Amino acid sequence: MKKIFAVAALLALSLPFRVAGQDPSAQLKDFTRLLQVADGLQLSIVHLNDKTVPVLFQPPTLYSIRAHAKEATMFYVQGMPQKDVNLDTSGFSVQQGGESFPSTPLNISHFEKGKVSKGDRIDGLLQLAKHIDVSKPFTVLHGKDSVEFKFSEDQVKAMTAPPAK
């Protein structure tokens, strides 16, 4: 767990990262969903995989996050409240095929239980204890709010880097 918190600290230093000559939002679009978690707060939830991690992170954080994302399903969470809100990060879970998987929130910036002021950027990670099957639809839940992820065959293929030659 200490390693994950060290990763989160390194992560704060590496954001935001831009790939030269490429539009990061276009690269993340297929793997991002918007979740309304409170009046005045919408969070971008990005599925972390071989396609999204290099867009969001730079070395050495990139290598650590990619390794963790290969061990268990992870999401990058970002948002900015339009007014003061109370955020409860303990309420995130994922459902797939009738099973519910709790998540562990990792704070990078303002992604912890409590008050978040208008305009404060929220950054964090959600980590599941295991991998879910990304070839099947799944839902990220926060209390009564939810958003569905359903990836195409091509998107699932893009999530895994080709083997090294």
Describe each model-derived feature in a short phrase.
Residues 4-16:
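Sec-dependent N-terminal signal peptides
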Residues 21-165:
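Conserved functional micro-motifs across diverse proteins
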